[in-house]
Amino acid sequence: GQRVGYLSWQPDKPGAQMLRTIVPSTLLSVLIITLLCLFMVRRIWTSSLSLSQSLVRLGASEAQAQHLAFHDVLTGLPNRALVEDRLTQALAAALRHDRRVALLLLDLDRFKNINDTWGHHAGDELIREVARRLSEIVRTSDTVGRIGGDEFIIVMPDTETIGQVHTLAQRIISALSAPYHLLGNELWVGVSIGLALAPKDGVDRLELMRKADIALYDAKNHGRGQFRQFEKAMDESLRTRQELAAELRQALVNFTGLAVWYQPLMEINGERVVGVEALLRWHHPTRGDISPADFIAIAEETGLILPLGEWVLREACKTSLKLPQVVVAVNVSPVQFRSSGFVSRLLEIVASEGADPQRLELEITEGVLIEDEHAARSSIIALREAGFRIALDDFGTGYSSLNYLSSFPVDKIKIDRSFTQSLGVADNSTAIIESVVRLGHAMGLTVTAEGVETEGQMHALANAGCNQLQGYLFSHAVPLTEIEKMV
């Protein structure tokens, strides 16, 4: 239990001196660690913020892509995909709740003229304005979409009455037919509308759209600027037209059943033939005689009017050589007139047949002139310089007959048969015809009256001062052999 020794430690530096050495190093280390932590925290926060912003941008891009996938770029309206989806949903809801859905297909009339005359920028502006007008007319529950260049579609869910749909269609026609003041110009278009109603016309989306399209086709064929509701007869009529188109194409292979007949143009006393009009006839092997009003329209729609028109022109050239004492008139379709190289092709045909252009008269309608006035005027001038006579057919039934007389160099006006038929029926009919005749003569034009069927009409037209008469009173269209006996 006795202490035998002890240990003693004597530091090199006393405690106070050690603290003065250790504390600064420790504080510096703590500061460095703190700064490193703050730097790391800042990097993490910055990265998080950047990631958040990237996610926001990605979300916006996805939203924009989603919008573009289902909306028209030009107008912002729903596109075909979105409209079809909403139509499918509306049809499903209508079946569940025993409601009706209306579908309207719209096609602008004469829109191509805007693009051709004023350029695509004007066309785009007009499309935007059409979209705006449509959006203002429909209900908030309706869907307005753009499904093509000048094609629009409207889905009307929960339709109460068909009268409600008809009222909307008429409002659309009125709104879209009003003038458009764009880029310093006043522009005009019309609209044709086809209607189909579910479940009456079908409960399938594709079937309903097909029937609305058939109704739209019917609206166009009845003069445009109107609406048509689908009827079963329209479907049957369309099938018949498609069959006739195929059969007409086959007939053109060797012109089987096709013939050119001629109706005489008489001098004012009805005693002498001064000209003949070439009129196409088609005798179908099983259907019999097909009305020109039917197959000519089909030929224009399908483009068959081009080879058909050339064939008629060749036949007319041959007839002009057989009947050198009269002028042979040939109708020129608007489709023909506007086709590329029309004038040069016509001159080639006449030259190849050895015909004299001065013995040929080309009949055009006002519809030819309104499409592209500058191009139409150039073509007419070229044709007249080549020796052809130009007649303005169906005068008085178009948009601005008097304006065209002063703007286009024609040789003859043909008063439409509707004015002739009104003689003795409408109080102002005689005064109208007399005014047209005076105007024509003042401009140095020949005036022909069409549709003369009675002696009374002939005398009234003679008293009005017409130069030539044409109609059933003198002769229907007959084969060339019959005309040769009359000349």
Functional labels for PLM-detected ranges:
Residues Q66, F70, G76-L103, D109-R139, ...:
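Conserved long alpha-helical elements within nucleotide-processing catalytic cores of c-di-GMP signaling
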Residues K232-E236, T240-A355, T365-V368, I381-A382, ...:
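Bacterial c-di-GMP phosphodiesterase EAL domain
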Residues G184, I268, P285-T286, S333-S340, ...:
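EAL-family c-di-GMP phosphodiesterase catalytic domain
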Residues R99, G145-I147, I162-H166, L176-S192, ...:
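Catalytic core regions of nucleotide second-messenger enzymes
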Residues V144, R171, A175, H181, ...:
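Cyclic nucleotide signaling catalytic output domains
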Residues A65, D72-L74, V83, L87-A90, ...:
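Hydrophobic scaffolding residues in well-structured cytosolic catalytic/regulatory domains
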Residues V155-V165, L183-E186, V191-L208, A233-S237, ...:
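Catalytic strand-loop-helix junctions within cyclic-nucleotide turnover domains
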